[in-house]
Curated annotation (Swiss-Prot):
This is UPF0178 protein Hhal_1913. HAMAP family: UPF0178. It comes from Halorhodospira halophila (strain DSM 244 / SL1). Pfam families: DUF188. Belongs to the UPF0178 family.
Length: 151
């Protein structure tokens, strides 16, 4: 298992949780972004910078992800693509996307896009709370505990 992070919009607190988890478990962690990302010196943590542009980081993650990998993203279309490829997807608030829930999330996203396009103010996401950070850390730990042994 490898962990891939859609790092352009990933909150710093979530990156810190991921850095600690990668160091503790030895699971490879790669942050993909269209700008430089600082990562701690580690044999299991690295960053990949892609060209600027719409969804370039997403496309790079889809190109590299393998079945069984974990992708951290709040981007619902990216989550749908990696699930289709056999990977797992987890958002920064600790919600694990599944084949059963991703279609509903895509439909809601499309509906909200339609509302915004028609001029309706749909508001934005709430700031990441301590509860969100804890939910993320807990779900990440569950996923890492269930990964196949590396021996």
């Amino acid at each position: 298992m490898r962990i891939w992070v859609d790092a352009d919009a990933c909150p710093g607190a979530i990156k810190e949780i991921l850095f600690r988890a990668a160091q503790r478990t030895g699971v490879e962690l790669t942050l993909v972004a269209n700008h430089p990302i600082r990562v701690p010196p580690s044999p299991v943590i690295r960053s990949v910078q892609v060209a600027a542009g719409f969804d370039v980081a997403d496309h790079e993650i889809v190109r590299r992800v393998a079945a069984g990998d974990l992708v951290i993203t709040g981007d619902i279309p990216l989550a749908a693509e990696v699930i289709e490829a056999g990977a797992q997807a987890l958002n920064p608030r600790g919600e694990r996307y599944t084949p059963e829930t991703i279609r509903e999330r895509l439909n809601m996203r499309d509906f909200m896009d339609t509302l915004r396009a028609s001029g309706v103010d749909t508001g934005g996401s709430a700031a990441l709370s301590q509860r969100d950070r804890q939910a993320f850390a807990n779900e990440l730990d569950r996923i890492l505990a269930r990964r196949p042994s590396q021996g």
